[in-house]
Curated annotation (Swiss-Prot):
N-terminal signal peptide: 1-15
Binding partners and assembly: Homooligomer. Interacts with TEK/TIE2. Interacts with SVEP1/polydom. Interacts with THBD; this interaction significantly inhibits the generation of activated PC and TAFIa/CPB2 by the thrombin/thrombomodulin complex.
Record's function text: Binds and activates TIE2 receptor by inducing its tyrosine phosphorylation. Implicated in endothelial developmental processes later and distinct from that of VEGF. Appears to play a crucial role in mediating reciprocal interactions between the endothelium and surrounding matrix and mesenchyme. Mediates blood vessel maturation/stability. It may play an important role in the heart early development.
SMART domains per record: FBG (SM00186)
GO CC terms of this entry: collagen-containing extracellular matrix; extracellular space
Superkingdom of the source species: Eukaryota
Pfam families according to UniProt: ANG-1 (PF25443), Fibrinogen_C (PF00147)
Protein name: Angiopoietin-1
Source organism phylogeny: Eukaryota, Metazoa, Chordata, Craniata, Vertebrata
Localization terms from the record: Secreted
GO biological process, one term: blood coagulation
Disulfide pattern: 285-314, 438-451
Length: 497
């Protein structure tokens, strides 16, 4: 603004200096217009003209108060007047400039205020638009950030849950791993102990094997010697058995002779007394008992369809008496490993071990209905029995098949004899239902069926050697399949006794 005013003042002075060469237009009315352009603003200044010519009156040229010099006096007065005039003009211009400056300042204030107000309004609107846009963008970004934050939180929650689950799984796995490690350590310790024990056992086992080898060699030598002794004993036993059979036959012949002599004496006494009674034969021990003979012993019976009488042992003491003994084992003195013919006709002594004979058993049980009772005794002194209400066997063509009904007794809840019918087998007559030939494997003659749960005609074993013997005297449901009994007795009695 100061530069502008200085420029205006300088222009006014120059204009005044050159006023002598200018003309006033009659239209201007004695005024002069000066227009100044400053930026976008244009300012017009109206300057008043001085009345009269540029020169002062001649009276002023000769003012007595003017300074005088050595130069011509007329020119000095003119210069003084001119300076005074210029000073006066300068004062006027100064006043006008002050007015102009005041006017400009006032106008500039209002214009600047208006400009500032417009600028502020424009800036405010722009700022409002920018602020609105920023608020919208901020809200949108906030919403997006909220969504992202929600997603991040959800993902973080999932990750935290997964992390917790993984932590739990890891903890469980670590716990299981520790347990398994402890178990492995315990197993390792046990294995170490077991290995140590195994080493010790191997050493002991080697020592025992060496001892057993020595004992085996000694036993083999002993077995060889015993085998030779047994063979010699068998030979002697066979010879003794042959001699015993001869003696038994001689004894039977003597008993028959004595019996005949007794009968003859009885007949002679009756004839002498004038009384003659008809002799009544006994069919079995029941008839003997009913005839008044109640003492156990050997009696002669007459069996239907048999050509000769038969000596039998009658048990008159057990369960009412009247029992005909058909089989008895007690001491192993008689060999029961015999053939078909011997089992057919019987063998042994009725007062000891013997077998009555299948043909005689068939003949007796064909006379009437009989009950079978089997008495058993083990090596511990325990007695038991099995009883069958109905008992009979078939003829030789039927292989002396066994028929039984109605089992009772104390020698097992089940029958050790085959109830549905089994054929009799011996070492030379295999009639069983097994491909193994039970009579050869189990010894003796019996109703084996498929080797079955019983064999009372098996090998006799003494005390201490009677265990684990499948071919012994066995009754399965009393003492098991491999226990050999001490004594057995098979006897029959009429059902209606």
């Amino acid at each position: 603004m100061t530069v502008f005013l200085s420029f205006a003042f300088l222009a006014a002075i120059l204009t005044h200096i050159g006023c002598s060469n200018q003309r006033r237009s009659p239209e201007n009315g004695g005024r002069r217009y000066n227009r100044i352009q400053h930026g976008q603003c244009a300012y017009t200044f109206i300057l008043p003209e001085h009345d009269g010519n540029c020169r002062e009156s001649t009276t002023d040229q000769y003012n007595t108060n003017a300074l005088q010099r050595d130069a011509p006096h007329v020119e000095q007065d003119f210069s003084s007047q001119k300076l005074q005039h210029l000073e006066h003009v300068m004062e006027n211009y100064t006043q006008w400039l002050q007015k102009i400056e005041n006017y400009i300042v006032e106008n500039m204030k209002s214009e600047m205020a208006q400009i500032q107000q417009n600028a502020v309004q424009n800036h405010t609107a722009t700022m409002l638009e920018i602020g609105t846009s920023l608020l919208s963008q901020t809200a949108e970004q906030t919403r997006k950030l909220t969504d992202v934050e929600t997603q991040v939180l959800n993902q973080t929650s999932r990750l935290e849950i997964q992390l917790l689950e993984n932590s739990l799984s890891t903890y469980k796995l670590e716990k299981q791993l520790l347990q398994q490690t402890n178990e492995i350590l315990k197993i390792h310790e046990k294995n170490s102990l077991l290995e140590h024990k195994i080493f010790e056992m191997e050493g002991k086992h080697k020592e025992e094997l060496d001892t057993l080898k020595e004992e085996k060699e000694n036993l083999q030598g002993l077995v060889t010697r015993q085998t030779y002794i047994i063979q010699e004993l068998e030979k002697q036993l066979n010879r003794a058995t042959t001699n015993n059979s001869v003696l038994q036959k001689q004894q039977l012949e003597l008993m028959d002779t004595v019996h005949n002599l007794v009968n003859l004496c009885t007949k002679e006494v009756l004839l002498k007394g004038g009384k003659k009674e008809e002799e009544k034969p006994f069919r079995d021990c029941a008839d003997v008992y009913q005839a008044g003979f109640n003492k156990s012993g050997i009696y002669t019976i007459y069996i239907n369809n048999m050509p000769e009488p038969k000596k039998v042992f009658c048990n008159m003491d057990l369960n009412g008496g009247g029992w005909t003994v058909i089989q008895h084992r007690e001491d192993g003195s008689l060999d029961f490993q015999r053939g078909w013919k011997e089992y057919k006709m019987g063998f042994g002594n009725p007062s000891g071990e013997y077998w009555l004979g299948n043909e005689f058993i068939f003949a007796i049980t064909s006379q009437r209905q009989y009950t079978l009772r089997i008495e058993l005794l083990d090596w511990e002194g325990n007695r038991a029995y099995s009883q069958y209400d109905r008992f009979h066997i078939g003829n030789e063509k039927q292989n002396y098949r066994l028929y039984l009904k109605g089992h009772t007794g104390t020698a097992g809840k089940q029958s050790s004899l085959i109830l549905h019918g089994a054929d009799f087998s011996t070492k030379d007559a295999d009639n069983d239902n097994c491909m193994c030939k039970c009579a050869l494997m189990l010894t003796g003659g019996w109703w084996f069926d498929a080797c079955g749960p019983s064999n009372l005609n098996g090998m006799f074993y003494t005390a201490g050697q009677n265990h684990g013997k499948l071919n012994g005297i066995k009754w399965h449901y009393f003492k098991g399949p491999s226990y050999s009994l001490r004594s057995t007795t098979m006897m029959i009695r009429p059902l209606d006794f």
